[in-house]
C-alpha cells in the first residue's frame, strides 16, 4: 500500500491554512513549505504538529517542486493553502492507494470554487480539473510566472471527489489578484514577443463574458455568476491593456 504525502506551500495564510491541513490529516505525512510568512501561519502549522520547512519564495513552480522533493513518500497530494479535500475525495484517494502501487501515474481532480457565498458550478471555473495526486517519480510541476501544473509520464486517471477552493476573501481581494496576475502575464508575454493588436483585448473580453455568462451557465448562478463572468472578462481585457502599455515603453 503506497503511503501518501500531502504537500502544501504557504505564505501569510493564517485565515485558511488550518482548514486545509485538517482536510489532509488522513494522509501518512503532511508537509508545509512556508515562503516567509509574517503572520501566524507558521505558528498554526507547528501547533497542528505538521512538518514545516522554511524556504524563501522564488516562484510557484520552483517552490512546489522543492516541496514535493522534500516529501517522505513518493505518492504526493499537492494542495494549496486556500483548498480543502472533500470527504468523497478523501475516500477515493484512500481507495486508489489501497493496492500495492498507485494504479495510474497521476489523477486529475475536479476543483469547485466557493465565491460570494455559493458554489460556482459553471463559467470557466468549473470543472477546473487539476492533476494533484501523482507519483513524484513520474511527474513534477512545470509552467511560468502565472500558471503552473503537474506534468507526468504515464497514464492519468480521474477522480470524482472535489477539491474545495476558496481563493478570494472578497471582491476587493479578487480585484487585487487580477491586477497582480495580469501584470505577470503581460510581462511574460512581452518578453516572448507577443503583440497587443488594436481592439483585440476588448473583443476577447466581450467574448469571454458571453462564454462565461451565457454559454457556461453563469446566468444560472445569480449575482455571483454575473460577478464571476465580469471578473473573468476584466482579467482578459487587463492582460492586453498592460501588454499594450509595455509595448509603448520600447
Protein language model regions, located:
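Catalytic-site signature of metal-activated, phosphate-bearing donor transferases
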Residues: 68, 74-75, 79, 86-250
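Conserved beta-strand segments of alpha/beta enzyme cores
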Residues: 29, 51, 155-157
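Cell-envelope/extracellular polymer assembly enzymes that use nucleotide-activated donors
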Residues: 3-5
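Glycine-rich, basic loop-to-helix element that forms the pyrophosphate-binding segment
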Residues: 56-71
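A conserved acidic beta->alpha catalytic loop
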Residues: 23, 34-44, 80
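Short, well-formed alpha-helical segments that are part of the catalytic scaffolds
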Residues: 7-26
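Acidic helix N-cap motif at the loop->helix transition within catalytic regions
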Residues: 15-18, 39-48, 88-89
Amino acid at each position: 500500500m503506497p503511503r501518501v504525502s500531502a504537500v502544501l506551500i504557504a505564505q501569510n495564510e493564517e485565515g485558511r491554512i488550518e482548514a486545509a491541513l485538517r482536510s489532509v490529516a488522513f494522509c501518512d505525512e503532511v508537509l508545509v513549505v512556508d515562503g516567509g510568512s509574517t503572520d501566524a501561519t507558521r505558528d498554526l502549522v507547528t501547533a497542528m504538529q505538521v512538518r514545516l520547512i522554511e524556504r524563501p519564495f522564488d516562484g510557484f513552480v520552483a517552490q512546489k517542486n522543492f516541496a514535493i522533493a522534500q516529501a517522505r513518500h513518493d505518492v504526493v497530494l499537492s494542495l494549496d493553502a486556500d483548498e480543502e479535500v472533500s470527504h468523497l475525495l478523501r475516500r477515493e484517494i484512500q481507495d486508489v492507494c489501497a493496492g500495492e502501487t498507485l494504479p495510474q501515474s497521476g489523477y486529475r481532480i475536479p476543483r469547485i470554487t466557493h465565491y460570494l457565498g455559493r458554489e460556482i458550478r459553471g463559467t470557466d471555473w468549473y470543472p477546473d480539473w487539476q492533476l494533484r495526486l501523482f507519483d513524484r517519480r513520474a511527474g513534477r510541476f512545470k509552467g511560468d510566472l502565472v500558471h503552473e501544473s503537474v506534468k507526468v509520464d504515464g497514464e492519468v486517471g480521474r477522480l470524482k471527489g472535489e477539491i474545495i477552493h476558496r481563493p478570494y476573501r472578497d471582491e476587493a481581494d479578487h480585484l487585487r489578484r487580477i491586477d497582480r496576475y495580469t501584470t505577470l502575464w503581460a510581462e511574460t508575454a512581452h518578453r516572448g514577443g507577443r503583440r497587443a493588436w488594436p481592439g483585440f483585448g476588448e473583443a476577447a473580453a466581450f467574448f469571454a463574458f458571453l462564454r462565461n455568462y451565457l454559454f457556461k451557465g453563469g446566468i444560472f448562478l445569480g449575482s455571483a455568476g454575473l460577478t464571476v463572468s465580469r471578473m473573468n472578462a476584466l482579467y482578459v481585457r487587463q492582460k492586453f491593456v498592460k501588454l499594450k502599455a509595455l509595448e509603448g515603453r520600447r
